[in-house]
């Protein structure tokens, strides 16, 4: 969206959607089984990079639930910090930075294992309540590459759809076993917990179709964050031909 709005002619075009909600979680320093967003009032939370979707989604959720983002914690404002790089947020939190942080899996599970943090809420579930589904993760390529490699992209999308269909029926243990070669520092039980969490929040798409409704939800979040001057044209940055063909032909 950013590159498209800059006027670059060879901008990226989305052709398949992978996840339909934010995959991050709010992490506290202690177990909080009765956590609500009100618990963030007057607190610091590590939110990620300015202009990034994780931060924008978190701030959108807070605003839509009546919280005020700012640095006046005595007045109950939530101080969403953007000064800690995304890749070191968990380590910074373990080192004492912030009262809360956000984390994706498997980082959240690792923090619980190390007792440096405890997952208390899903940003994805909270954002779905106020914005609906959003195209959080999608596959894209440049206009030129797409025009020259339609067969390759179609075969890739077909394979993705097969994987999505398999994930619908596979058990958490089966999915975790398939993931394990890529996460060899995590136990199978930890990976099962990761899969369970993402199943519970319904994060994964059942098919690769990238809808206009979901793009509009993301655009609203970006506009609320002040990061978007104009909305992109859906048909310019999304091509659904590959997804539709995959859904028609892959059995």
Regions found by a protein language model. Give the residues of each.
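Secondary-structure end/capping motifs
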Residues: 146-229
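Pocket-lining segment of extracytoplasmic ligand-binding domains
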Residues: 7, 85-182
